[in-house]
């Protein structure tokens, strides 16, 4: 196979980009707005006028990239630190921690979109499991006013080690789903008083109907997450921004909009059918909701006289795809389950199929390590395989459009057996294996996609990408990608996490005094670049531990340098049956940007002609 170039430390990038930034007499403010799960090509002046205005009047990052695995916490960690996942250790939304996390429900595979779980993981990894400083933490320590408002999990991640719980301690203002309850991040009396004066409750309202995913017989929600996010916008515009202006010093505000992600996941527009999938009315209402939030923030900046001194960076964490639950090869799809339509893949299909192929007992880490009986699937899809569930040979962390496999004993023979089993399944499209396990035909090493770095959390042994194709009757493949997903959600609902271009093509734009106006950036950019660029805009002193770092997007700045980009393809050696993992990428200097990866014919965006398939309805 072709070995990739070694990624150089981006410290050189940071140093060489200083010419792009003028020395401002007054430091600028910065707002990072994240419309979770927003596909780049879905933004038009009609569907999302506020975001289209930022893109068209500011900088249009038309060649944008989410990091693989394309999940929220993974990409949140990249935006927060400027590092790739091999350094942050946030390999997906559900990871193997190597210990039992009590706040996560006594499991070794916690779902980490949870403040208490993040705090618990921090405690087990020297107080900061990311092992890299976040932009918001550095800004706070540099004297900026700082706040993070929005979706539970990634919002707190931006300053997860600060806490106002001790006298004299500094922290960012954090407002998320848990604010006001026992598991929420505490808020100061100053913020509480301001919220009360503004007529706002001290507890965040629930998602209500937007949180209802339905089941195999009941459609999910038809409501966007409007009331909850309206509350968060009110906190930002009526409390936080006026407070920051009154302090008369620069600020950084992170606003993480759960929509359109939540509406695209849970929508009830397409139960068990591929179309309209994530292009139905509920998903579009979610896009509008996020857009309305951005419009409200920009209006508040205007009203407060802050627009001229505020840079706004808008970037989605990932794209999105419609879920498929179809497979002709999976043994688990041939078993009947009470909660799964006939012949559809059940939640946890990867753990079930591997247990059968490897002839290993399967236990449920989300059910007190109980054995998974015949005809049942793991409650959350995760699985621990081996004779002793407390000392597993193999762990499956279920996530969605891709899954993580851990081998706690670093068993090379088991790794090869697992890969052989994966290659036999039609739902697999691309396999990445820990470099330390050696080269395995049909797979590429984790280092090729920047998943092998200085992370302190356990590294996955194998990352499995699932098959994707373009829904029938679609003219824009990235808008209607369909992917096999290991999830409780149903065929026709929404998911991400795969290496398809539908999931890697996230919306990105920027506007403000330190960005060009009306500029279309042809160069590849990524969510890791967001973190590093934010740090440079704020003139923060960063001391990275890992070397998997993004680059400052100098080409988007007045008088900034414009580097050159090239494209490339990396192919693994073929497996016995001829399958090979192929990675389509671009380069800017030593930086690599990953468009799509998988087996040819099974991943959207990998081939010249996007794979298409007629989908059955159930």
Name every feature range the model reports, one short phrase each:
Residues 85-88, 147, 163-207, 274-292, ...:
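Acidic, His- and aromatic-enriched active-site or binding-groove loops in soluble protein domains
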Residues 157-168, 220, 236-296, 326-328, ...:
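Active-site His/acidic residue clusters
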């Amino acid at each position: 196979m072709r070995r990739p170039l070694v990624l150089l430390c981006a410290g050189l990038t940071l140093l060489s980009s200083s010419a792009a930034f003028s020395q401002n007499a007054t430091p600028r403010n910065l707002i990072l707005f994240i419309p979770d799960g927003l596909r780049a090509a879905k933004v038009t002046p009609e569907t999302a006028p506020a975001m289209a205005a930022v893109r068209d009047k500011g900088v249009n990052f038309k060649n944008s990239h989410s990091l693989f695995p394309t999940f929220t916490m993974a990409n949140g960690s990249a935006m927060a630190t400027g590092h790739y996942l091999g350094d942050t250790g946030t390999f997906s939304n559900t990871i193997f921690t190597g210990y039992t996390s009590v706040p996560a429900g006594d499991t070794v595979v916690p779902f980490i979109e949870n403040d208490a779980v993040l705090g618990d993981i921090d405690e087990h990894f020297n107080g900061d499991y990311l092992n890299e400083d976040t932009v918001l933490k550095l800004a706070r320590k540099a004297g900026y006013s700082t706040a993070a408002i929005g979706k539970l999990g990634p919002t707190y991640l931006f300053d997860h080690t600060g806490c106002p719980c001790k006298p004299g301690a500094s922290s960012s203002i954090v407002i998320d789903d848990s604010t006001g309850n026992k598991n929420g991040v505490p808020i100061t009396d100053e913020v509480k008083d301001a919220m009360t004066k503004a007529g706002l409750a001290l507890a965040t309202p629930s998602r209500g109907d937007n949180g209802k995913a339905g089941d195999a017989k009941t459609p999910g929600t038809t409501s966007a997450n409007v009331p909850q996010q309206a509350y968060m916008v009110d906190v930002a515009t009526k409390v936080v921004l006026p407070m920051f202006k009154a302090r008369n010093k620069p600020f950084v505000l992170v606003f993480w909009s759960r929509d359109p992600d939540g509406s695209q996941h849970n929508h009830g527009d397409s139960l068990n059918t591929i179309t309209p999938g994530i292009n139905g009315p509920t998903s579009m209402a979610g896009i509008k909701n996020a857009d309305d939030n951005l419009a409200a923030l920009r209006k508040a900046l205007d009203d407060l006289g802050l627009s001229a001194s505020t840079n706004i960076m808008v970037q989605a964490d990932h794209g999105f795809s419609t879920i498929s639950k179809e497979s002709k090869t999976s043994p688990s799809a041939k078993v009947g389950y009470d909660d799964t339509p006939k012949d559809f893949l059940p939640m946890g299909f990867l753990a079930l199929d591997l247990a059968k192929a490897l002839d290993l007992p399967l236990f449920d880490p989300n059910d007190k390590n109980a054995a998974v009986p015949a005809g049942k699937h793991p409650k959350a899809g995760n699985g621990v395989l081996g004779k002793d569930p407390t000392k597993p040979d193999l762990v499956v962390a279920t996530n969605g459009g891709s899954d993580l496999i851990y081998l706690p004993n670093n068993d090379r023979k088991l790794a090869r057996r697992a890969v052989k089993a994966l290659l036999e399944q039609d739902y697999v499209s691309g396999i990445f294996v820990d470099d330390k396990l050696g080269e395995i035909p049909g797979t590429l090493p984790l280092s090729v996609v920047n998943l092998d770095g200085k992370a302190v959390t356990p590294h996955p042994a194998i990352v499995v990408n699932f098959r994707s194709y373009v829904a029938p009757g679609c003219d824009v493949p990235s808008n209607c990608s369909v992917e096999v997903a290991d999830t409780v959600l149903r065929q026709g609902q929404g998911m991400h996490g795969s290496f398809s271009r539908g999931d890697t093509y996230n919306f990105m734009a920027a506007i403000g005094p330190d960005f060009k106006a009306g500029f279309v950036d042809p160069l590849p950019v990524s969510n890791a670049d967001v973190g590093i660029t934010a740090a440079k805009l704020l003139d923060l002193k960063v001391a990275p531990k890992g070397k998997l770092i993004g680059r400052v997007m100098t080409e988007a700045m007045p008088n900034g340098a414009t580097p050159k980009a090239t494209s490339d393809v990396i192919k693994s050696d073929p497996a016995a049956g001829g399958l090979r993992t192929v990675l389509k990428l671009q380069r800017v200097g030593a930086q690599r940007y990953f468009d799509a990866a998988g087996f040819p014919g099974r991943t959207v965006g990998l081939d010249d002609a996007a794979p298409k398939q007629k989908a059955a309805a159930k």
